[in-house]
């Protein structure tokens, strides 16, 4: 497939050093309580999220991206003050097609790999709890 990777940016609260090392393929030495910018180990993750704002009149989409890596993030920092500044991190996720061939990856009854899938809340196919209880794929069915 000649289609390229998809890149998405998530703005998140700054994770623990252990989690940051895990998702970026770096090292966290628990004995020394030290994050180490070691050589990266490529690790793939599925990521699920809700797109759209219910209160904004948008039809929320429940999304799963099946295979991707997190890039080393940009961090924002503020000097110490008495204000209410928040510090977040922009984490870039690059999604690619799965190696796995889903039975319904190219539609019902058509095998294929997939990068992602989503359903709209209004479709009544599944609740958010059902959709996110495990990674929902083109082969997932809901009761």
Describe the residue ranges of each PLM region.
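Oligomerization/assembly interface segments of phage tail-like spikes and tubes
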Residues: 1-20, 85-98
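Alpha-helical context
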Residues: 4, 25-30, 41, 69
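Beta-strand elements of well-folded, non-transmembrane domains
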Residues: 12-16, 51-55, 69-72, 95-99
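Short, solvent-exposed secondary-structure capping/transition elements
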Residues: 18-23, 54-60, 102
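Short, low-complexity, polar/charged sequence segments that are solvent-exposed and flexible
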Residues: 28-32, 66-71, 82-85
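Short helix-loop boundary/capping segments
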Residues: 38-78
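Mixed-charge, glycine-accented linear interaction segment located at domain edges/termini
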Residues: 72-143
């Amino acid at each position: 497939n000649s289609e390229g990777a998809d890149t998405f940016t998530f703005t998140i609260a700054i994770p623990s050093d252990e989690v940051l090392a895990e998702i970026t393929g770096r090292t966290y030495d628990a004995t020394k309580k030290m994050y180490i910018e070691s050589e990266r180990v490529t690790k793939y993750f599925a990521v699920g999220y809700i797109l759209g704002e219910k209160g904004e009149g948008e039809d929320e989409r429940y999304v799963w991206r099946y295979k991707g890596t997190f890039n080393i993030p940009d961090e924002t920092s503020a000097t110490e003050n008495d204000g209410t500044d928040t510090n977040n991190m922009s984490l870039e996720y690059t999604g690619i097609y799965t190696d796995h061939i889903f039975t319904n990856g190219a539609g019902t009854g058509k095998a294929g790999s997939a990068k992602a899938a989503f359903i709209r809340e209004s479709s009544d196919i599944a609740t958010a709890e059902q959709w996110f209880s495990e990674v929902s794929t083109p082969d997932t069915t809901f009761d």
